[in-house]
């Protein structure tokens, strides 16, 4: 976990790459891992990751931006602490300067919830995180299973994630927010097969709100990639 985050860009369609620049701005040999990268509609790059620079039992969630297409990186910003150590972060953007970061946060009693923090100023600052599904999943280790997000043209934010909830049954859920990440709808379970293990969901959302969610579905003797589609937001 002792890593440094670096970013390299190509200006010739991927034929060559320029020398990399450091993303994390602390000098310590410490965890900077499970990163995510997103480009918004105006060309800003948004990066999120799990960062152990404070030396606490649980690391924090950090973000940074590039305002010049990857040539330089802004000062790092701590969004929150108490982050699950190995569930990858996710970052995306929406209309009117909205930026969203998702991760799995550890609450008292080893309750692990998927949360989203929002920025209303293109990622300069972030508000306190909001719990998405209220799963109340107690798990005394890191599940290694991240969330995934997407936003449609009207600004609806969609989140998909894995949890085992209070019944300890593996499941993939989706929820959405129509108030720019202040609150979330009731969650909806996506996987319907019995005696399988749904894993690592990913979502893609087009501007009109057509949604595709894919995940791995493991059975005792095989592993499939399963897809769920919505055409009506």
What are these regions (language model features)?
Residues 1-233:
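Extracellular, repeat-based ectodomains that mediate carbohydrate processing or recognition
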